[in-house]
Every structure is written in C-alpha cells, then in structure tokens.
Amino acid sequence: MDLSPNPDSPPSGGGNGGGGGSSSSNSSPSMGAGAPQSPSRYEAQKRRDWNTFGQYLRNHRPPLSLAQCSGAHVLEFLRYLDQFGKTKVHTAACPFFGHPSPPAPCPCPLRQAWGSLDALVGRLRAAFEENGGRPESNPFAARAVRLYLREVREHQARARGVSYEKKKRKKPQQQQLQGGDSSGLHGHQHHPPPPPPAGAAC
C-alpha cells in the first residue's frame, strides 16, 4: 500500500514543484487569453485528494467502486488518515488535556486536525460531483460525515484548549464619518460673538 496522503499540507506547496510559480502566473491576467492556465492551489489539492481517495477505494478489501461508496466508507477513510496526522490531541488522562501550549512533550497521539478534515471533505464533496456523481447520493455530504466532523471539532477543542468559533468582525465606527466637529480641524470655524446690546454703548 503506497499511499502518502497529506491533506493537512495545502499551504506548504512542498509536494508539487511548481507550487510557487503558479501564484505568479495568476498575477498577470492580460497574458493568458490563449495560454493554458495552471490550476489554482485549491484545484491542484482537490485533484490530489480525489486521486488519494480513489487509490484508497482500489486498495480496500474488497475493492470498492465509487457507486458502492457510502458515508460509512468516507468515515473509514477519514479515520485511516489519522495515522498521517501532525496535530497532538491530548487524551483525558494527560496532564496537558485542555492546555493550548503544553510545557513539555507527552505520549498523546497525533491526529488529523479538524480544520484539515473539514477542508478535505469539502474538496472531495465537490470532486465527487465534478466526476459524475449525483448530489443526492454524495457520500461526502452524508449526515454521518457531518456529525463526525462536528464530534472531532468539539473533542479537539476540549483536548487542545482551543476555540474553533468564528471571530466576530468589528463594525466600522460611525464616529469617524459623523463626529468631525469635535476635532481641532474645525476650531477656526466658530461664529463671532454677538455684538453688545445698543444701550451698552458709551
């Protein structure tokens, strides 16, 4: 079995020799009307993931066709990928359980990070339909797969002491648009004081 899947290394670009050059070719859109454009990093990673999954199905005992593949097989594939993970996930018995920055090494297992699995499933869900699969029978969109990903996220958040909640974006402050009157720039525009009353004149 000669599989070397690496779903949590899309940013590195180490696996494809031309990863660094593809981003520079996208920076000059005026050149490429007739020239073949190299696939984006996402498309290249999606193709690699799809090939890895296809190889997994072929090496399965018994071998599976894509039509036979179910959500249960996807879960089996995701668990299989854990052996290639690089993320330390502390067990409940570990003294560093829940610590985001443990001060010393521990024997806890390495797993695939939740974010890597979530992105992988998204790419494979798209690739399944691009390769002729019907959306209603997409095993990567199965409820069991969604529940598994949610379970992994919650477990890793507790074990690693990190939060996977999305950060709320701050709204732009309205004072910069409205509150210019209090700034020193408008200090010279004060109205002159009213003239003294007529009876006050000598």
UniProtKB/Swiss-Prot annotation:
Domain spans labelled ALOG: 41-168
Compositionally biased spans, kind Low complexity: 23-36, 173-186
Biased composition (Gly residues): 12-22
Similarity-based family: Belongs to the plant homeotic and developmental regulators ALOG protein family.
TM annotation in the entry: none
Protein name: Protein G1-like4
Coiled coil spans: none
Biased composition (Pro residues): 192-202
GO function term, MF aspect, one: DNA binding
Domain of life according to the entry: Eukaryota
Sequence motif: Nuclear localization signal, positions: 166-170
Protein localization: Nucleus
Species, as recorded: Oryza sativa subsp. indica (Rice)
Known role: Probable transcription regulator that acts as a developmental regulator by promoting cell growth in response to light.
Region of interest (Disordered), ranges: 1-44, 158-202
